[in-house]
Amino acid sequence: MSKQLVSIIDVPKHIGEEITIGAWVANKSGKGKIAFLQLRDGTAFFQGVAFKPNFIEKFGEEEGLEKFDTIKHLSQETSIYVTGMVKEDERSKFGYELDITDIEVIGKSQDYPITPKEHGTDFLMDNRHLWLRSRKQMAIQQIRNAIIYATYDFFDKNGFIKFDSPILSSNAAEDSTELFETDYFGTPAFLSQSGQLYLEAGAMALGRVFDFGPVFRAEKSKTRRHLTEFWMMDAEYSFLSHDESLDLQEAYVKALIQGAIDRAPQALEILERDVDLLKKYIAEPFKRVSYDEAIDLLQAHENDEDTDYEHLEHGDDFGSPHETWISNYFGVPTFVVNYPASFKAFYMKPVPGNPERVLCADLLAPEGYGEIIGGSMREDDYDALVAKMEELGMDRSEYEFYLDLRKYGSVPHGGFGIGIERMVTFVAGTKHIREAIPFPRMLHRIKP
């Protein structure tokens, strides 16, 4: 049997040709003289059909019956080389199918644990290495791949340079209570929460930089939106205003959505994602509302029949129900800007004339997906940043390199970060972030 293989996703290019596919058996059916195989090879799913008389005619009765019997008794996830003629077939949901003419078993699969029936989440997570083979899980990973590809493409086209920040650090970029600590040859070190502080150094050297890699948050949270290890894209840029930053973030998110539509249409179809709704998010401008305007809206509607969130005062932080209501109210991704300085990071630049608010923005995704981007203008004045750190009781010695950036040619600059898993969850339309990464790390899960 020829081993010049054709990927399933390329099968439509070979109508009327005999081809060979390397695949796994996802499922099978049939009776009597006919057998149907549901095949997958990582690129897509496909159906093959085998007819007993055709095998007897081609190989003779003994060998033909043996090969057909092999097909009928293939178990789930057996790996095979399958050869056949690609034929158009309107009855097939693919529009074509493979008329199987030969088969070769590569690797047998006995007692595959994830059978085509309902399984509990814990069981599926314990068998995550196998669950990834299922149709929906494959689709989610294909969307993840499309979003990562679109990330690199977007930043390259917009003049950004890939800049790799360290994973081990001696300081905290975000909440110091959420750090994973390790011993670095006798010195305390921490797994990175964000590459932002180092990216600011990159922006002062290269103008526009971005980083993409794993980050770690020791959050004792069991919500559907939190992981302890996830992949973050951080971008930093010099000589860009707050409004220009929001424009860039909006363009980036739209590019990610478009990238998934262009590169993973079959995956979106498998997940039954409303593509027209995704296209609406691309076509319409994102809404921008200030934190204080958002609080006013929440207070004005808190007694509405369909609301389900707690009362907030100005100065309170949003919870997930508040974020959901705000984004659903506007119906498109919504930037909430200028939050109180009291619960935002030390490095954020105050709003001119209003030191109680900072030049920052969170992008809230509709449909209940909440925050997907956080960004801000960074404090570029040395004395102001030192004063803020002293106010918070921070140890300046751990941030000397960061303060140096304000001493030697400081410029207006800002940046933002996006957790790729949250974006994948939003674009894919899935309910839980654990499915947006191959092997999720959560509060009570570190295996497999």
UniProtKB/Swiss-Prot annotation:
Q: Name one GO cellular component term.
A: cytoplasm
Swiss-Prot/TrEMBL keywords: Aminoacyl-tRNA synthetase, ATP-binding, Cytoplasm, Ligase, Nucleotide-binding, Protein biosynthesis
Give the top-level enzyme category: ligase
Concerning SUPFAM superfamilies, the annotation shows:
Class II aaRS and biotin synthetases, Nucleic acid-binding proteins
Q: Name one GO molecular function term.
A: ATP binding
Catalysis: reaction(s): tRNA(Asn) + L-asparagine + ATP = L-asparaginyl-tRNA(Asn) + AMP + diphosphate + H(+)
Q: Which GO terms describe its biological process?
A: asparaginyl-tRNA aminoacylation
Return any one Pfam family short name.
Answer: tRNA_anti-codon
**Localization terms from the record:** Cytoplasm
**Main subcellular localization, coarse class?**
cytoplasm
Spell out the InterPro entries in the cross-references. Aa-tRNA-synt_II, aa-tRNA-synth_II, aa-tRNA-synth_II/BPL/LPL, Asn-tRNA-ligase, Asp/Asn-tRNA-synth_IIb, NA-bd_OB-fold, NA-bd_OB_tRNA
Q: Does the keyword Electron transport apply?
A: no
Its domain of life reads Bacteria
EC number(s) reported in the record? 6.1.1.22
On whether Aminoacyl-tRNA synthetase is a keyword of this UniProt record, the answer is yes
> PANTHER family recorded for this chain?
ASPARAGINE--TRNA LIGASE, MITOCHONDRIAL-RELATED, ASPARTYL/LYSYL-TRNA SYNTHETASE
Subunit structure as annotated in this protein's UniProt entry: Homodimer.
Protein family (similarity comment): Belongs to the class-II aminoacyl-tRNA synthetase family.
Q: What is this protein called?
A: Asparagine--tRNA ligase
